[in-house]
Amino acid sequence: MNEKRMPLSAIETPAVIVNMDVLESNIAEMSRLAREAGVRLRPHTKIHECPDIAKLQIAGGACGIEVGAIERALCMAEAGIDDILIAHPFYGDHKLAILRRLLDKPGLKITVMADMIEQAEEISRVGQALGRAIPMLLKVNTGGDRFGVRPGEPAVRMAKRLCRLPGIAFQGIYVHESGGNPTPEGMDRLALEAATMAVQTARLLSKEGVPGAHVSVGASPTLRATCALLKGKRFPEITEIHPGHCTIGDMWHVRALANAREACAAAVLCTVMSAADPRHVVIDAGYKTFGADSLIQYQDMPGFFWQGKPSFGSVQGREDLWPGRISAETACVQYMEPDPAPAKRLRIGDRLEIVPNNATLTISMQEKIYGVRRGGVERIFTVAGRKDRTPAV
């Protein structure tokens, strides 16, 4: 242990901390599952937006990383990460300028995504101007109903059009499943349906003579179900998976079965500002720290409400506390027992660690994350992917 490291008590609150033991365990589990399934792991980094955590994932066995918006790729490339997949299709001059900037970096492999010919044609023009073929995947919608063309014949028709574009190197297809019932059986079913549609589409492409060896599927809630399918060699066409949130975990993904509660690595460290009311205490973090995601989509699950209120997180080590009233810069954490014993009462100045509902939102509002181990700060991570920190083109 480094005796000179910052003690946890020296961190100014509110702040986001990440338990290094839990983070490393999550990274190791993701890599192990992918390795046993015989596929590449390309974690989505939207949960942390941090190049140093991405490097830990690559050191743990990931083949590269994935980002959502193209802007998020800049900080990762600047940090020396050399294999980046941009998961969201993009369009417009500003986005293309960022693409050019990325393509100018020696040794950097950038793979882009499309689900419309209009996006691909713009990227094609960039590739032609640079005298190179830009790797591209076709995003296929297997039921998430966000980006993507439908699987089967619609995907085959679009893939053929992409293959005819100069300046494009068509690589294959990409699926990101979502939805499903938050039960083990529901996740098994969702994983099977997504893998089946992806592989059926890949087989159609091969039958039609369309080159495209890349077939990726995956999401955090279906990580274990997908890897179990692939470990059984049922879908040998699938080459890559791309879960993201289970690196860090949050209460959303506890409910979605992506993480156990103890596998949530991040928490908001906050301080009790007032204990004047016997029914609750007031902390120095509100929705400007936690975000405002109440996870209302899970309102029918048992324990979602207490006294008519949803929670904005879960207090570490205190199941008797309910963080259920939140405003801009403060929040109330309520005692669930009507008259708690003196030993259970919080005092002004006490600190709480609260696992947020949506860690992506929480981390995106921070400039740094404190990596802690055994009561001290082991390292400080920069949240370089924050939108307001993205370098200008």
Regions found by a protein language model. Name each.
Residues 223-308:
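Active-site loop ensemble at the mouth of alpha/beta enzyme cores that anchors a bound cofactor
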Residues 44-182:
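Active-site-proximal beta-alpha core segment in soluble small-molecule metabolic enzymes
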Residues 135, 142-258:
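Active-site loop/helix belt of alpha/beta enzymes
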Residues 23, 46, 76, 138, ...:
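Conserved, mostly hydrophobic/aromatic
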Residues 1-18:
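Generic N-terminal amphipathic, Lys/Arg-enriched alpha-helix
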Residues 2-3, 22-53, 66:
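N-terminal glycine-rich anion-binding loops that anchor highly charged ligand groups
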Residues 279, 283-393:
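C-terminal accessory subdomain/extension
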